[in-house]
Amino acid sequence: MNGFWLAHDALVAWLSHGVLAASWWQIVIFALVATHITIAAVTIYLHRSQAHRALELHPVVSHFFRFWLWLTTGMVTKEWVAIHRKHHAKCETVDDPHSPVTRGIKTVLLTGAELYRAESKVQETMVKYGHNTPDDWIERNLYTRYSWQGVGLMLVIDLFLFGAIGAAVWALQMAWIPIT
């Protein structure tokens, strides 16, 4: 019975504090840094580098952003780029995948992820607008094929590091991009 209580106490300690036993302000700093990296990845990598080809990133930097976006958003580079390019090509028309003019600002702000998912299934959009995006082995066999497993892994990481409060950290990370 001693082993049971030892395991019980270890589980309670982990749920209470995670492996880092971080203070509340350290958890807040982590969440802010992680969400900032996600915003930078969307802005620098997806938007400037991939969608508009306005910036050439070193392959290591590009791959870091691809990996980070897989962990924190589940977004597939080709899909995001194709949808964004179509948005510019069909701006504020009924063909714009996320126009606040035709769909309403509330819809775009509150269900932007659903609009993204729906448009990502339109093969014509992917073919016409998704060119010149990564198409290597890891993109096809991990980042695209298992796009949502990345965010699942991020949940496991957050729970491991911070215990039960890691679920709140993860929820913030998942909500951050659709909100901002």
Q: For each of these PLM feature ranges, what is it?
A:
Residues 1-180:
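Non-catalytic, topology-defining segments of multipass membrane proteins
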